[in-house]
Each structure stands twice: as C-alpha cells, then as structure tokens.
Amino acid sequence: MASPCLIAVLVFLCAIVSCYSDNPIDSCWRGDSNWDQNRMKLADCAVGFGSSTMGGKGGDFYTVTSTDDNPVNPTPGTLRYGATREKALWIIFSQNMNIKLKMPLYVAGHKTIDGRGADVHLGNGGPCLFMRKVSHVILHSLHIHGCNTSVLGDVLVSESIGVEPVHAQDGDAITMRNVTNAWIDHNSLSDCSDGLIDVTLGSTGITISNNHFFNHHKVMLLGHDDTYDDDKSMKVTVAFNQFGPNAGQRMPRARYGLVHVANNNYDPWNIYAIGGSSNPTILSEGNSFTAPSESYKKEVTKRIGCESPSACANWVWRSTRDAFINGAYFVSSGKTEETNIYNSNEAFKVENGNAAPQLTKNAGVVT
C-alpha cells in the first residue's frame, strides 16, 4: 500500500499536471482523431449559460473559398455571403485565409463559423464581427486581430432584413447586441481598436471559453451602460480562457447581470483583472491569478462608480477555490452562501485554481 506521503505527492502532481489534461469542452471532441468527419458534434460540447447554442447544427455545410468582400452584394464563396444567409449553415474554410472586411460582418442566426483545419485570420486593419438580435451563433478557431473602426455605410445585415445604413463601429473584434445563445470558443484575439468582446443590450445565454486574449488593453465588456436595465437578466459564463500576456483590464468588466468566471488563467494585468459597476453578480471560481510586480496592482477586483466602499458592500462578488500568485488578492462582498446557478444541461465541473494553467494550455485557435 502506498504511504500517505506518496499519496499526497501524487494528488498534488495530479492537480497541477496530468489529471486535468483536458477541460470538459475539449474532452468532448478533441480526443476523436476523426473530428473533421463529424464537425457538428462540436455543438454538443458547450457548457455554462451558452450550452444550448446549436449554431448551424442540422444545416448544410458552406465552404468559404474566397477572401473577397462585398458588403452590399456578397458573392457565393465569400464569408459574408454564408454569414448572412437566412438558413442554418456550418461555415468552414477551403484553405488558410487572411480576410480583411470592408465593413462589419453581420452574422445571422443559426450559424457556426468553424476555422478548424485551416489558419483563418480576420481583421487585418478592417472592421470585424457583429451580431444583432440573433441567436444560436458559434465562433470557433479564428484569429481575430487588428480590427479597426468603420465608417457610416450600407451593409447587408441578412437575407430577410436586407441592406441597411450602418453607423460607424468602434473597432471591436466581436460585438453582440441583444444576442441569445452564443458560444465563443478557441479563438485568439488581440490588438483591436476598442474591445475584444462586447456583450450588451440585453444579450444573455453566452459562453466565452478556451480563448486566448493578449496584447490588448480593454478585453471584455459585459453590459451596455449603467442605465440599461435590460442587462439585469444577462447571464455569461467565462471559462478556460488564457488572459495575457499584455492584457490590461476588463477580464471581464460587467454591468448588471450574472457572470461566472471559472478555471481561467490570468497573467499579470496592467490595471485590474475583474471589474464591474451597477451591482453585477460575479462568481469567481477555480481561477489562477498572477499579480503584477507593482504593489498597488495586486488586487484582482475593481468596483467602479462606488462613492464609498459601503456603497458596494452588498454586491455579490465571491471567490471560491481561486489560486493567488505573487500577492494577488480578491476582495469579496455581499452574501457568500453557495447558489445553484446552472440547470443540469449547463452545469460543468470546475477544478481548483491550481489546475487552471493546465486546463487552459490549449486556449486559443486549434487547427
């Protein structure tokens, strides 16, 4: 029989190395060497609040063969043509591609944009991805970087809506406005004019997982502004992501709503890691936070818009089983009792924070 000391060592090694080689999303599909023969199985693998997202499952495959872009009258074979069709589509790519869009790409509902098997880059100095009043969208294995602002101009929003004049956009990588059931998984996002992901204007049922966020200051905004009450119903899961290197703040920054931040790995931040205003509920569980070297940047959290500490004392911000490195610390507040936030289809196992580096080792694009 193994000695108690040996068992303790094995448990420790398991926690940090071998026993958490895959998180529950990756173990759902990546272990199958023939995943490309059953691409749509991916839609069964989401967890958290976006777990019901089907994307283009059950629809036809659509193959992008051209990097061209016509914002008003897209041609078959281009990404914009597939993304704006009314029917469910699973969009794949015929080869490696660098796509510079001329105007924001509106993604219609029931779409999967699946970059697996190719090296797909979006942005490159042009505007990027936009979703408005749609549901069931999956974005997977895309490099999205260098997204820039756009000017006022006409854009095909979808087959049913047609062409509309679109206001100038800020240069986000991914914008979601009044979107339900969306899953953003295994993308690499960096270096855009504004944010990397914005989830606003009543969006809910969102999972953001296995992404790599780096070389960017304002990473992720959840909630429109402090006066937009519809965001009180927002529910977002942020899990298994790698934040950094060189990620400044907003990982995420929430207004209202409920945000579960689980098993993410944080490199040193520039200002703060997790922040919010307007009384969001933030449940931090099993994350690994490595603080910057500066003593005044050690706090993980930042409460915004509080006239005094007592003004935010009832906000429910809770840290459970997080790992804190180099002096990092989380300031909790509000009620601390456990709550069951997920139904049986949404729930997933969250490991202790010391396992987060291993669970996020494959974050970002997979091919």
Swiss-Prot record:
PTM: N-glycosylated; consists of complex-type N-glycans containing the Lewis a antigen (Galbeta1-3(Fucalpha1-4)GlcNAcbeta1-).
Pathway of action: Glycan metabolism; pectin degradation; 2-dehydro-3-deoxy-D-gluconate from pectin: step 2/5
Chain spans, region IgE-binding. Binds to IgE in 3 out of 7 patients tested: 317-327
Annotated signal sequence range: 1-21
A family per Pfam: Pectate_lyase_4
Known EC number: 4.2.2.2
Protein name as catalogued: Pectate lyase 1
Species name: Juniperus ashei (Ozark white cedar)
